[in-house]
């Protein structure tokens, strides 16, 4: 069982140099920790692309990467993210308790209500995140 917790307060730029802060996480969103050097991120990318076509807001957290490599990676493979927060030193990732990439956080109104380490796939989506999303929708 996952104990919900507050999303850490932050102010960072995204990969396109726009300012992003905690307030960007309203409603239901997924925060996916990824990097251009991460092999498993490549594996989960098609599923994230499919997910991004749903009404779920998918936000990237580019982790310990170079902006240039990250932009090239998305340029080649497609960008499923509404925006991707640039976290070159891993500061926000550290505050979130990230141990590596990929990791995905389910966030509802700035509360982290779910978390998985490793690849997000259809099975984990259905068994872990969907019940939490349904519960969040029922309480709002």
Q: Which role fits each region the language model picked out?
A:
Residues 20-42, 48:
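Short active-site neighborhood of thiol/selenol oxidoreductases, capturing the structured segment around
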